Amino acid sequence: MLEAKIDPLVLARDIVRAYLDTMEARDLARARRFLAPGFAMIFPGGRRFTELEEMAEWAKPRYRWVKKRYERFDVAQGTTATHVYCFGTLYGEWNDGTAFESIRFIDRFTVRAGKLVDQMVWNDMGELAAKLN
């Protein structure tokens, strides 16, 4: 009988995608299960969050909702962890009801022992919001 081997790079990518799906649905309790102790999210401008609820509260005055269209996931094995890069665009609705779309983003995740250690976020949302105000 052949034993199936799970590719660790594919597994890391799938963990990130499942986490992103739960975050998009704002199922924070389920999303928390993907996180390693000490997990941190770092957003543009150096804004750092260690609690998902804190990030969700921070986002409330920025937009009503946001979703991601994924272009690709790139995965690289490091010496102590796997790094998953997620590329795409954001779309959603500002708090005034105006729709937005095509906002570029890149997220970089560090995955170790099947858990997310950190997430670094880069996007053009702040630049677009500044133009609208």
Q: At which residue positions do the language-model features occur?
A:
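Residues at secondary-structure transition points
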Residues: I6-V10, T50, F100
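Exposed beta-sheet edge and beta->alpha loop/turn motif
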Residues: T89-A113
